[in-house]
Amino acid sequence: MAKLYFYYASMNAGKSTNLLQADFNYRERGMQTLLFTAGIDTRYKQGVIKSRIGLEAPAIAFFEESSLWDIIQEQHVKNPLHCILIDEAQFLNKNQVFELARVCDDLNIPVLCYGLRTDFQAELFEGSKYLLAIADKLAEIKSVCFCGAKATMNLRVDENKKPIRHGQQTEIGGNERYIALCRRHFIEKLNSL
């Protein structure tokens, strides 16, 4: 039986790089994959998964109203798929996570999801919440805090690198807006305000 995987990490841990490597491994063996990324992420061109080290691949952009089941099933009928890979999985909604589980269960296609576990306020994203709840396999991708400890938190900062405590859960950004920290330094930075 195919499995639903959730690979989670803080910012700058190499989630997209890992996804692109997994995609390459499948394709190198002549297997068909289908890649998705969040349409809300506009750091690069829409419908492109790009890693900080320069690797990239085309992907289907998903939105709040997207039916991943319909898209995957339609593609699978045309050309049998061997793996589905989802970048920015924290932006999935509950229904989409359950659609991905159905892809595993009914179509027997493994689904590999990569995303953040928590936001800048240490709150779960909707997609992450349901992936943590129903994924068959959970794996943490390690990142490093400036102190050398494991980074598990995402600190949002302003243009002067000052910590931000409040705001919308979703604000797209990279190294200019977020710093991956260990829990200790995350709390220290927030308490320094």
Curated annotation (Swiss-Prot):
Residues where ATP binds: 9-16, 87-90
This protein's UniProt keywords: ATP-binding, Cytoplasm, DNA synthesis, Kinase, Metal-binding, Nucleotide-binding, Transferase, Zinc
Reactions that this protein is recorded to catalyse: thymidine + ATP = dTMP + ADP + H(+)
Subcellular location field: Cytoplasm
EC identifiers of the protein: 2.7.1.21
Domain of life of the organism encoding this protein: Bacteria
The keyword Cytoplasm is annotated on this UniProt entry: yes
GO CC list: cytosol
A GO biological-process term: thymidine metabolic process
EC category name: transferase
InterPro entries named in the record: P-loop_NTPase (IPR027417), Thymidine_kinase (IPR001267), Thymidine_kinase_CS (IPR020633)
SUPFAM superfamilies assigned to the protein according to its UniProt record, in alphabetical order: Glucocorticoid receptor-like (DNA-binding domain), P-loop containing nucleoside triphosphate hydrolases
PANTHER family recorded: THYMIDINE KINASE, THYMIDINE KINASE, CYTOSOLIC
Subunit annotation: Homotetramer.
Protein name: Thymidine kinase
Organism from which the protein derives: Zymomonas mobilis subsp. mobilis (strain ATCC 31821 / ZM4 / CP4)
Gene name tied to this protein: tdk
